[in-house]
């Protein structure tokens, strides 16, 4: 569903990927390169101005503490930074669960604990935290808003929720200077492991533009001044 909102030139998504496997899971294909590349390798090739990382749902487990999750996730993010030091890091909140969901081992309490750990992780490392959960959550129940998760599993976001999420992304920004070096040729992103792209993919000429960072709202949240590499890249996972 993410490719209804982003260009395939600036988004990566892989089924079942986790924050813990961010540095090591090879899932991205590029024209002219054999096999799959890891997220850090992909970011280095795509040379984005910023990345928005959305991981955590696939990490949820009663035996995996919030602090351990954040520690493992941070290692993956640092691998992305090491691969392309000029990139701005934006960590998106884990989306809320539905009040009724198919995997009863997952709890909204744990989602909230993981998100609190992500806030601290970002503060400790100078990264930006995008609190998109606030637009997806029903403040009266603490769960996802009605109609925001699929009725089939109560976990994955609906089109209505994705509309709200991407509106939130576009309207929360904090402008930073583009410090990337001169960009080299960016290879064509041709596929992601276990992901099929439907017919509604957004073209590269109409791609959504993410915020510079996510500390404060700004009326002019769009900036399409990138030349060569994508202005942003979204790394996301799906269960």
Give the ranges of each region predicted by the language model.
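Ser/Thr/Pro-rich low-complexity tandem-repeat tracts
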Residues: 217, 222-228, 233-239
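Conserved SGNH/GDSL esterase-like catalytic core that processes O-acyl groups on lipids
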Residues: 1-71
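Sec-exported extracytoplasmic/periplasmic mature domains
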Residues: 44, 56, 65, 74, ...
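Structural recognition of the beta-strand scaffold that forms the well-ordered cores
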Residues: 14-16, 49-55, 59, 88-93, ...
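Charged helix-capping and loop-helix junction motifs
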Residues: 66-76, 110-114
């Amino acid at each position: 569903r993410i490719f209804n909102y982003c260009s395939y030139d600036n988004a990566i998504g892989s089924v079942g990927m986790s924050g813990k496997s961010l540095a090591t899971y090879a899932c991205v294909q590029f024209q002219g390169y054999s096999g799959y590349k890891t997220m850090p390798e992909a970011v280095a090739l795509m040379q984005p101005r910023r990345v928005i990382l959305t991981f955590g749902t696939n990490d949820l487990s009663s035996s995996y503490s919030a602090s351990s999750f954040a520690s493992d996730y941070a290692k993956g993010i640092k691998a992305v930074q090491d691969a392309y030091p000029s990139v701005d890091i934006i960590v998106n909140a884990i989306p809320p669960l539905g009040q009724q969901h198919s995997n009863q081992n997952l709890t909204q309490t744990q989602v909230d604990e993981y998100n609190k750990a992500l806030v601290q992780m970002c503060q400790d490392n100078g990264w930006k935290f995008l609190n998109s959960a606030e637009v997806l959550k029903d403040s009266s129940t603490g769960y996802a808003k009605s109609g925001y998760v699929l009725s089939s599993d109560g976990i994955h976001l609906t089109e209505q929720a994705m509309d709200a999420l991407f509106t939130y992304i576009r309207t929360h920004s904090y402008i930073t200077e583009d410090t990337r070096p001169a960009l080299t040729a960016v290879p064509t992103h041709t596929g992601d492991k276990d992901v099929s792209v439907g017919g509604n993919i957004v073209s590269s000429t109409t791609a959504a533009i993410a915020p510079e960072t996510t500390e404060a709202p700004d009326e002019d949240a769009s900036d399409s001044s990138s030349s060569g590499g994508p202005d942003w890249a979204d790394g996301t996972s799906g269960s």
